[in-house]
Amino acid sequence: MGTRLKVLRVFKDLHRTRRDVFRDDNRALTAARVKINEEFKKNKNETSDDNIKEMLKMARAVETILRESVIQAEHVDENKIVLRPRKSLLLENVPYCDAPSKKT
């Protein structure tokens, strides 16, 4: 696959992830869109294959972090926050046990 297609694919993947991660949060959606577009425009004239590969690697890492680590939270009261995790984050969730297990 050509470099141009790889860049376009990463660009689209970042925007898809942005839409999924920040669903129903217009402020975060807009800020993420602006930042993604700004970074890609800033580097659109890059010609070095090594630099492009490094930037693609970084963009993939950012996309992975957004997809796997970011969770939405909303203040609903002075001392209350509602978390809205995506289903993909809960698949590998293991309940925390506060009591240590006894060894026999």
From Swiss-Prot:
Keywords: Chaperone, Mitochondrion. The lineage of its organism: Eukaryota, Metazoa, Chordata, Craniata, Vertebrata. Belongs to the complex I LYR family. One of its GO terms (biological process) is mitochondrial respiratory chain complex III assembly. The keyword Signal does not apply. Disulfide bonds: none annotated. It comes from the Eukaryota. One of its GO terms (cellular component) is mitochondrial matrix. It is found in: Mitochondrion matrix. The keyword Cell cycle does not apply. Assembly factor required for Rieske Fe-S protein UQCRFS1 incorporation into the cytochrome b-c1 (CIII) complex. Functions as a chaperone, binding to this subunit within the mitochondrial matrix and stabilizing it prior to its translocation and insertion into the late CIII dimeric intermediate within the mitochondrial inner membrane. Interacts with UQCRFS1. This is Complex III assembly factor LYRM7. GO terms for molecular function: protein folding chaperone.
